Amino acid sequence: MDWILPIAGIIAAIAFLILCIGIVAVLNSVKKNLDYVAKTLDGVEGQVQGITRETTDLLHKVNRLTEDIQGKVDRLNSVVDAVKGIGDSVQTLNSSVDRVTNSITHNISQNEDKISQVVQWSNVAMEIADKWQNRHYRRGSANYKANNVATDANHSYTSRVDK
């Protein structure tokens, strides 16, 4: 049985050697994977730096656009305020026109009889003025014709006598 112990030692040494070879193989495989991961991370790092630069540029552009839009909004606010003021003025004007219209309508309805009398009197006055003008015109026309007839008669008589 003495020989079992050295054989067991040899078997244990061989097993340990196989175990070490397996561990070395696994470690080599892990090393290859880690090298691949390192290369991939280097590529990703470069891409991330590129993305970071582009993102920074985009943020600067967005900030400039935001400032531009803010300036335009501020200018537009003054326009909106002006339009609101115009709207308020138009509304006030409409209210004033409504009040004046209502006042006129109310006054007309209260003074309807007086207005009717004024219209009747103005019609009478216009008729009198027309009759006065017609009468004056007829008188002027009659005198004109009478004077012309006498003048024409004298002129005709004297012209015949002189000849």
Curated annotation (Swiss-Prot):
Keywords: Cell membrane, Membrane, Transmembrane, Transmembrane helix. Belongs to the UPF0478 family. It is found in: Cell membrane. Coiled coil: none annotated. The chain crosses the membrane at residues 7-27. Its main location: membrane. InterPro entries: UPF0478. It is a single-pass membrane protein. Pfam families: DUF948 (PF06103). This is UPF0478 protein SAOUHSC_01855. GO terms for cellular component: plasma membrane.
